[in-house]
Amino acid sequence: MSSQGHHKMSGGGKKGAMEQDYTDVVDLGDRFSADMARLCMNEQYADVEFIVEEERIPAHRVILAARSEYFRALLYGGMAETTQRQIPLEVPLEAFKVLLRYIYSGTLLLSTLDEDSTIDVLGMANQYGFQDLEMAISNYLRQYLALDNVCMILDAARLYNLEELTEVCLMFMDRNAGDLLLHNSFNTLSKESLEEVLRRDCFFAPEVQIFLAVWKWSRFNSNVDFKSVVSYVRLPLMNLEHLLQVVRPSGILDPDKILDAIDERSTSKALPYRAALWPEENVAAETFLSRCIQGECRDALLDGDVTTYDMENGYTRHCITDSKDAGIVVELGTFCMINHIRMLLWDRDSRAYSYYVEVSGDQQHWDRVVDYSDYHCRSWQYLYFEARPVRFIRLVGTQNTVNRVFHVVGLEAMHTAKVPRLVNHFVAPKTNVATVEMSAIVTDGVSRTRNALINGDYVRYDWDSGYTCHQLGSGEIVVRLGQPYYLGSMRLLLWDCDDRTYSFYIEISTNRKEWQMVVDRRNDRTRSWQNFHFTPRPVVYIRIVGTRNTANEIFHCVHLECPTQDKNYLKKIADMEKEREKREKEKKTAKTDDDNIASTSGSSLASGHAESPSTSSSSSQSVLRSIHWPPQTREVAVAPLTPPALSPPGTPALPAPLTPATSSPHNNHEQNQPSNISADASHHTSPSSRSNPSPSLSRSRSQSAELEPVPPLVELDTRETL
């Protein structure tokens, strides 16, 4: 046991040894605090006196200086107070005594203080630099917010720059806006705090009620210029009756302001709505009085059931047409501030949908917040956009790869603080989105389990299971993500239970028609883990095509993730990006200097200082060709390749060569003319019609014969048939 632990001490005696516990750590902190507390406001040993509200309070310089940087500078910093015995302070007396007790004892019982004293102590803690006490009081006040104290606490929080306490107060006022406007404490708000409250979109109450409260506040604060305050009242949100019968008779607004408000209300396409804010809560629910007002089978959309649905029940739908009125429309119970929508598309097969989402405040003017009309999507959709007041949500399907109907099983709408990085409205994820949980699916390839490539298990694999494969020259592996993501990296685990190597390339697409090659390893011999980095772009489909296996004619992949989750590789990417930005900045600086020289000399030097092409100039066909780090900063344009066609259903079982292939993968690729394959064009291939294209094909016949029978493979060339 360590020297700071407990020990046992034994001693001899007629009745045997006796054991006694002891410790080498002496902790008498409570007694020390009590002794120090007795010195508080005690004449004994006192060497300074504070004059507060004409009362003399003795204190000890060294204790105050040790506890506060403010007092150290005041009492030992060479100022006039350094040599003075008596120092006057302009602070509340009772609150100062409370603070002194805290300085000497380190404890403070806040429950014994009234609200005014608590605020006074908070102010002195801020003034004298007691940050721990300031934070403790701030946290205490957060727990006891009420209508009769929130205005006072907000003023104090803003005065002392307590941002967290300020935000909590504002959110409390948002939640209780209607009651707060009628409470007498509202009239005690400072002008600056009132303006901060009124400018918030989520301070949600009828605008006429807000106007009346501001008008009343102006009468209680007649010495304040309230013109800037009343300017935060959103007059266009009031109807004509309120403007003419409430606002105009008050006489506090110019008649032209009222006319402008009437005109804006009738002509504006984007009124400055206020909305209720319920963080992290689904407001598209029956508990918030929300309802589906357009679409077929409307009751299913907001019932909260996202598990018990099939081909006949459990979804809301609309026919996909060119009509502007087509779609599924949800009316929220009231105006709500939202920035996130979760939507479950019908996913009992591998079909894909395209759609867009619009929001509105009046069903007349719609703002499109998400547009995936040109992208294939499936299952759960995670949509993010700039927070805004919303009353109506419209979902419009533009494509179904099986028929002309758009099916939605469930919808959630909320305001969340967990917003990922967005690039051109696409989510740029940090975590792996090529997973079953994120609605990804393997549409092409051969495996014992459908989604072995994206199930997250890259440890349990062997000769017979745990991988997805295709035959060289006549197949491919295709993964479809749940929705378009803005991606710039991937990581792939090639089957590596022996020392074989592979060659391959990777293409990406958003619609399975137009492909871009982003990784080219056809001339490399690779094995095990492979990291890739390419120019970021929207991605839905990922196509992996093997071109060589040094052991047999089958290409095997164990695991795919995008973006890569390799922390070391991500750090290298970040470092390389910083270096690239630094070089671009230096180029711009050099070009600016050259332009200045050219303009001064009167000669054109633009051609002599032209920039070299950047790596992003050919981003549409950029290909990463190096297997080693760092990736080449100069990408080489390569004509995109289309994979060979799959063998039609009913073809003979895959060959099982027992020796490594001798033919060139490039020759095989040329002999099999490439062709595009639609995922929705044909029927399923029977699992029993294929033999097992296992890595074990390279072993001897005797070894293969001794193997136990294995489950049949699943052919993942998925075709929708509904």
Curated annotation (Swiss-Prot):
Which residue ranges does the record assign to the BACK domain?
151-247
Give the PROSITE patterns listed for this entry: BTB (PS50097)
- Report biased composition (Basic and acidic residues) as residue ranges: 577-594
Offer one Pfam family short name for this entry: BTB
Q: Spell out the Low complexity composition-biased ranges.
A: 607-626, 686-704
Q: Coiled-coil segments, which residues?
A: 565-593
Q: Tell me which positions the record assigns to the signal sequence.
A: none
Residue spans of biased composition, Polar residues class: 597-606, 670-679
Record SUPFAM superfamilies:
Galactose-binding domain-like, POZ domain
BTB domain ranges (all copies):
46-112
State whether keyword Coiled coil applies.
Answer: yes
Q: Where in the cell is it found?
A: Cytoplasm
Which stretches does UniProt call biased (Pro residues)?
641-658
Q: Which GO terms describe its cellular component?
A: cytoplasm
The organs and tissues expressing this protein are described as: Detected in the brain (at protein level).
Look up the record and give one Gene Ontology term from the biological process aspect: adult locomotory behavior
Where are the annotated segments for Disordered?
577-626, 640-722
Give the disruption phenotype, in one or two sentences: Adults display increased motor activity during locomotion, fragmented sleep and a decreased lifespan. Walking speed is not effected however flies spend more time moving with slightly fewer pauses resulting in longer uninterrupted bouts of walking. The total duration of sleep is not effected but average sleep bout length is decreased, the number of sleep bouts is increased and the amount of wake after sleep onset (WASO) is also increased. Dopamine levels are decreased by 50%. No effect on flight or climbing (negative geotaxis).
User: Keywords assigned by UniProt?
Assistant: Coiled coil, Cytoplasm
Function of the protein: Essential for the homeostatic regulation of sleep and motor activity, by depressing hyperactivity and wakefulness. May function, at least in part, by ensuring dopamine biosynthesis.
Question: What is the protein's given name?
Answer: BTB/POZ domain-containing protein 9
- The protein's organism comes out as Drosophila melanogaster (Fruit fly)
